[in-house]
Amino acid sequence: MNYSEKLTGAPPMTEVPLELLEEMLWFFRVEDATPWNCSMFVLAALVAIISFILLGRNIQANRNQKKLPPEKQTPEVLYLAEGGNKDDKNLTSLTETLLSEKPTLAQGEMEAKCSDVPRVHLPDPQEPES
């Protein structure tokens, strides 16, 4: 007679069916957890090894990428880059030209022309007053 037979042998006074007792015995079984613990340890070790391998490959790939010379640009990319530089040069020269020119009308004169008020000639701010 083994351990499970001792536990499933229901006394005559209990009304719990034998099948329910066997199911409860299986559900609440107490066994040695060594196989489960060993399998979890092996799986954890396997995950750690794979992680270190992937980490090492990633580090090596980054090092190799830094060692490679920069990629040669295609003529189309060079043409676009030159075109952008030309546009920037034209834009900067245009802004320099516009900023260096003296504005023809002062703000006050501009407002006076727009309104119906008689013109008032404002003195040029750069002329010295005497």
Swiss-Prot record:
Q: Which organism is it from?
A: Bos taurus
Q: Which PANTHER family match?
A: ORGANIC SOLUTE TRANSPORTER SUBUNIT BETA, ORGANIC SOLUTE TRANSPORTER SUBUNIT BETA-RELATED
Protein's name in the database: Organic solute transporter subunit beta
Q: Which family does it belong to?
A: Belongs to the OST-beta family.
Where are the compositionally biased (Basic and acidic residues) regions?
A: 110-124
Domains: entry comment: The transmembrane domain (TM) is the major site of interaction with SLC51A. The extracellular-membrane interface is absolutely required for transport activity. The intracellular-membrane interface is necessary for establishing the correct membrane orientation that is essential for the heterodimer Ost-alpha/Ost-beta complex formation and transport activity at the cell membrane surface.
Cytoplasmic face of the membrane: 57-130
Q: What cellular-component terms does GO give this entry?
A: basolateral plasma membrane; membrane; plasma membrane; protein-containing complex
**Function field:** Essential component of the Ost-alpha/Ost-beta complex, a heterodimer that acts as the intestinal basolateral transporter responsible for bile acid export from enterocytes into portal blood. The Ost-alpha/Ost-beta complex efficiently transports the major species of bile acids (taurocholate). Taurine conjugates are transported more efficiently across the basolateral membrane than glycine-conjugated bile acids. Can also transport steroids such as estrone 3-sulfate and dehydroepiandrosterone 3-sulfate, therefore playing a role in the enterohepatic circulation of sterols.
Residues in the Extracellular compartment per record: 1-35
